[in-house]
Amino acid sequence: MKRKGMRGMIFYVVVVLVLLGFLLAGWLATATATQDSRLLPIIMYHDVVPDGEQLDEYTVSATQLEEDLAALAREGWQTVRLSEVIDFVQNGATLPEKPVLLVFDDGYDSVLTQVLPLLEKYDARAVVSVIGARAQGLADGCDTSRQYMDWDALSQALASGRIEMQSHSAQLHVFRARKGLQQLPDETEEAYAKMLLADMNQMDAWSEDAGVTMIKSFAYPYGFVEPLADSLMRKQGYEATMTSEPHVNRIERNPDCLYRLGRFNRSGCMQTDALLKWLTP
């Protein structure tokens, strides 16, 4: 009887240990998956103007931006650098539990006058998508609008340590027969590849001459994606691309996840509360 009781006890202990093993394995798998992936919303801004000026789909006020930054911090979101996201994917680096990426398209001069002071106030980071022709036109004296940053201003923003730069194309931020990077109907793949490579090389030459370091990332002008451009950019060493498709991104230890990243356009016609609702799928 004692042996039967002992056998029963041993059997019971074995069953419990097996169940605990399964539970522990499941917990470890979940923990590992959580460590190896993040949900990353990207908020896309354009121009930021002083309070009282006209707002539209691509223009927000300084107060709206400050309300966004305050709300993000209050809700536990942490702004991250694009280089940190790439490092997480490629090299196993860490990211906060609730990362968010802020991107300012086109390189408006408001990045220096309106955005940077608020980034410093809220200890935030951002990425600027640079249109090479705008910066170069100002540097050459061909553009006197002063609406955008020239290369010296971009260098100043970069020196803050809070801002990184990515390409928004050299001369393809256009909306004519060719819309952004779209291939023309009668354009051969060879001709398209030659055109795009020339634009990428021009952007590299301008930024290198100006001493402005660019992350190897590309924001599609107007959000127009092009399958042929995807493969060409990868061959040229681009590590990430961004669209204007409004969705949250899942970032994993797989470089493929960095291409065609979705972004939410922050309109000046919406409230911060509506913005926060976008951030979780």
Positions of PLM-derived features:
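Aromatic/hydrophobic pocket-lining residues that form the small-molecule binding cavity
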Residues: 65, 112, 196, 200
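N-terminal pre-catalytic segment of deacetylase/amide-hydrolase enzymes
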Residues: 11-100, 259, 263-267, 281
